[in-house]
């Protein structure tokens, strides 16, 4: 077995983990994007640039523009235009592939599957590309993805409404806010026309022509074989921060702390073998 750590995800958490682990063991950092920083921070972010410099100084092998597909028998199947399709040997896999907002099913929204309901990442990229999702969109959630989508919608002169079950969240980026309300259902014929919300037995209907799902972050799971339930047996560690409000400094701190836990676990595995 090759004594090398494989890290999938070159966002802030992945970079922070790589910067720490590479001081102890040979490390390879893999990301499907051709640049560092992930989809939320970007390659120009100062924290990402600083962490990448530390990784380079420690001899981290960067495989950007490369997707990790399958983890099996301490080998990672990777694919990319430069690497092709091949297996990469590693003694341990660290998955730092980030998070995603909950789906309509995970939010337990009742109603038919209607057009005009978008995951936050899709809504953001469409809006940035010039697509107008609607005139009166509703954004479910109030974290960084909700803010990012709202600011993009504002450039298209959309009157965005933010709804969140957390009454303490700051939402100064929205035109209208419904804090402390729980979204429970979607209504419309073919396309979404209204969102139903509930609070303390009261039910309200919010008219809209688009809904963006940007709330309650959940961990990505994109590598076949890297399953959380079998992580102990498969030499896999997961480093994913579920906070909706954490900034880059918070995520870097989280990644460094997680690296210490990974090192402790690897030492335990080595001692057992």
Question: How does the language model describe each region?
Answer:
Residues 1-273:
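Residues forming the flavin
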């Amino acid at each position: 077995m090759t004594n090398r750590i494989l890290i999938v995800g070159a966002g802030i958490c992945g970079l922070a983990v790589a910067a720490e682990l590479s001081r102890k063991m040979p490390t390879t950092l893999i990301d499907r994007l051709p640049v560092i920083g992930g989809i939320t921070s970007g390659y120009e972010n100062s924290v990402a640039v600083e962490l990448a410099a530390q990784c380079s100084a420690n001899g981290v092998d960067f495989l950007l523009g490369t997707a990790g597909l399958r983890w099996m028998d301490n080998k990672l199947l990777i694919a990319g235009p430069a690497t092709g399709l091949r297996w990469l040997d590693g003694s341990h896999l660290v998955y730092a592939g980030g998070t995603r907002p909950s789906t309509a099913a995970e939010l337990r929204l009742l109603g038919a599957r209607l057009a005009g309901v978008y995951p936050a990442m899709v809504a953001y990229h469409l809006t940035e590309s010039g697509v107008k999702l609607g005139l009166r969109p509703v954004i479910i959630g109030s974290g960084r993805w909700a803010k990012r989508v709202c600011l993009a919608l504002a450039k298209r002169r959309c009157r965005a409404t933010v709804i969140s079950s957390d009454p303490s969240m700051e939402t100064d980026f929205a035109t209208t806010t419904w804090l402390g309300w729980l979204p429970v259902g979607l209504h419309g014929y073919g396309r979404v026309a209204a969102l139903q919300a509930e609070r303390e037995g009261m039910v309200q209907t919010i008219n809209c022509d688009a809904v963006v799902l940007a709330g309650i972050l959940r961990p990505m799971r994109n590598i076949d074989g890297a399953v959380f339930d079998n992580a102990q047996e498969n030499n896999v560690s997961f480093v994913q921060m579920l906070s909706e409000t954490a900034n880059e400094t918070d995520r870097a701190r989280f990644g460094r702390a997680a690296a210490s836990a990974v090192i402790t676990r690897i030492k335990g595995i080595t001692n057992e073998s």
